[in-house]
């Protein structure tokens, strides 16, 4: 009887010792968080831009939108550069997705640059293009996160943190632009 009990305890101890516990969250969760955050930023940014469309202080709003578009443009370039450097560490499938995202971001940045010169005259159009630039960036990040998540086993471990860092920098600047535009619209 004691021998059977000893064997049972030994088997239980052996099975618990063989279990592997992972402390770090899987990369899949990290990319899902980025995707969710991109959707939230786009929603908030769109709501704020729509709410200031009727502001009485048009000069301040136009200046804030112009400055904001400059800032978003710089961040789009930085995000594109980060994607370029991440491509060197990625595998073939991830490289294709990263290259496509980078090209789409560069196209979005170019569209925003083209609409920049006559801010006073084209404030509404610039606001729309700025909103579209943020939306396109959020969509590209979401699409990229899905692509990388579908190839998690093949994706290099270095890729997810680089993507997250680049996107966090972009989202911080978008939030700063939001604040500045909102402050300009709030001034009476």
Swiss-Prot record:
CDD domains: ApoLp-III_like. GO terms for cellular component: extracellular region. It is found in: Secreted. Expressed in fat body and secreted in hemolymph. Also expressed in ovary and testis at lower levels. InterPro entries: ApoLp-III. Keywords: Cleavage on pair of basic residues, Lipid transport, Secreted, Signal, Transport. GO terms for molecular function: lipid binding. Residues 18-22 form a propeptide. GO terms for biological process: lipid transport. Residues 1-17 form the signal peptide. The keyword RNA-binding does not apply. Equilibrium between a soluble monomer and a bound lipoprotein form. Apolipophorin-3 associates with lipophorin during lipid loading until each particle contains 9 or 14 molecules of apolipophorin-3. This is Apolipophorin-3.
